[in-house]
């Protein structure tokens, strides 16, 4: 059996495998992961960040389109994927040309996740834990 690697960079490879392994849980789609990985320059944190954020933005637009047409299930699943892709981008934001984007990236992830939860078939409660 032949093995396949997306990247020679072990950190990139590990996170790409996590993204790929999220597909059965509707947190990614195999084709989206492959297409994103194909655009990333191996070992370049800026490239990693930019490409995953671009995928998150594209999938978010899909979610919003589905939501506007009343396709709640597809919208929810797309918002979950967008949230996961922003979280995947977040891992390397500190290795980019502008690490100050970390807060915006986290908020993007959280916004998409919260939008998915609003479309969940059972009630979901937001809980704040003060610490």
Where are these regions (language model features)?
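Flexible helix-coil transition and linker loops at the boundaries of alpha-helical arrays
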Residues: 68-72, 116-119
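Residue signature of alpha-solenoid helical repeat architecture, marking inter-repeat boundaries
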Residues: 27-28, 46-54, 72-73, 77-80
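Long, non-catalytic architectural segments outside compact domain cores
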Residues: 1-48
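N-terminal cap/lid segment of alpha/beta-hydrolase-fold proteins
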Residues: 52, 106-131
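Short, charge-rich amphipathic alpha-helical segments embedded
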Residues: 72, 76-104
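A structural signal for well-ordered alpha-helices, especially hydrophobic packing surfaces
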Residues: 60-63, 86-93, 113, 117
């Amino acid at each position: 059996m032949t093995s396949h690697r997306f990247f020679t960079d072990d950190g990139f490879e590990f996170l790409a495998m996590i993204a790929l392994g999220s597909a059965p849980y509707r947190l990614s789609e195999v084709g989206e992961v492959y297409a994103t990985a194909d655009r990333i320059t191996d070992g370049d944190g800026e490239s990693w960040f930019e490409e995953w954020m671009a995928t998150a933005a594209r999938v978010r637009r899909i979610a919003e389109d589905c939501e506007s047409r009343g396709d709640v299930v597809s919208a929810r699943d797309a918002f979950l994927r967008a949230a996961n892709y922003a979280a995947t981008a977040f891992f390397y934001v500190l290795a980019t040309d502008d690490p100050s984007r970390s807060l915006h990236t986290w908020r993007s992830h959280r916004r998409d996740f919260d939008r998915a939860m609003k479309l969940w078939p059972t009630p979901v409660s937001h809980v704040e834990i003060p610490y």
